Amino acid sequence: MRSGNLCVRARAIAHAFTVCRGAAPGVTRPFGAGCVPAARRGEAAGETKSGQAIKRETMGKAKKHAGLAVLLAVLLAGCQSGPQRRPQTVIDGFAQGGTYHIVLVGDSTSGGLKGQLDSLLWRVDNSMSLYNPTSRLSRINRGETDTLDRFIANCIRTADTISRESGGRYDITIKPLTAAYGFTGDRPVQQPNVDSLLQFIGYDKIRIDGCRLVKKHPSVQIDLNSIAQGATADYVARWLDSLGWKDYLVEVGGEIFARGHNAKGGLWRVGIDKPIEGNVIPGAQLQVRIGISNRGLATSGKYRKFYTDSLGRKIVHTFDARTGAPVISNLLSATVVARTAAQADAYGTLCMVMGLNESIRFLESRPDLEAYLVWSDDRGNYRTYMTPGMESLVLQ
């Protein structure tokens, strides 16, 4: 945790990566009343990964390093000419296999926050991580427990709403597919028998009964990677709200919630990366900068999270739960601004599943969502689509 000469630090980071360019929340429903607390210390032994899992996590976390782009965008925005009107403090660290960054604006004391924050993030990770074999979600998937904590319960409720809105295009029960294709640290199957897996996939195959998860079949498994980091940003934001912070930015693995205003009294500035293969350094090549406040933001794309199998096929991480097949489309990335970061995270994934035209039709029916889509035309040229509200957020 630091305060003081943030401009010097920002420029040092930017130089190291040869770039000088940047990148009441709450979950959709309240915390599950009466549910047991999230995993406590001693309940989970921490993450243990095989070499294959480490390789998959490094390759598969498409947004884990996006925090650097966000941090640079925030810090460098404060390095422009003119006085910095209010002090700000930066807290950063590691969580969920990636990084987190928090910027707090104001004079309120921030002593001891990092320790409390790391404790919160530890509890979330030991709840929802698929890479941690002792997490609550991992044990639920193995059938060792059916008891939900508030983190998993809230994600399931939010996901269920979006699954119903999308006719099942978005679905968190795709764990058998993501595992078969090697996106959850499991060893990929060269030619998965998709038909045999589809019988265990479907949002209607799970329901919450009190604090228990009821499955229609023991082999039904959940993958929260499309919503967990956004939900984590929301949890941190709610915690900061409870402490009285009015102006802050929370970023977890690239998913963002911004409250109030930055140190200069303006919107929080966030950079969106160009969705080109090889663009592995967040902030090195920006598509656009936008300003947000009191909203969540997330970007989904297929330009980082993929692998080439032994047959030379590019396998992307986005699946259509109805067919079980990886999605093939000309939509390269989808950035969504929503009421919460969890919603933005999930709706961004939904757009990638639906593709360009269906996403546009869906967004036109949803005035509560703003989006910035990047797609490729038949000649390979990059094109963009923005909702009317997103156009007003773009910074010139």
Give names to the regions the model predicted:
Residues G32, P37-E43, G51:
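Short Gly/Ser/Thr- and charged-rich N-terminal loops/segments
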Residues V74-L76:
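Hydrophobic core
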Residues A33, K55-G67, G78-Q396:
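Mature catalytic core of soluble alpha/beta enzymes
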Residues G46-T58:
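Short, Lys/Arg-enriched N-terminal segments with co-localized hydrophobic residues
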Residues R2, R9-R11, R21, R29, ...:
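Basic polycationic patches enriched in arginine
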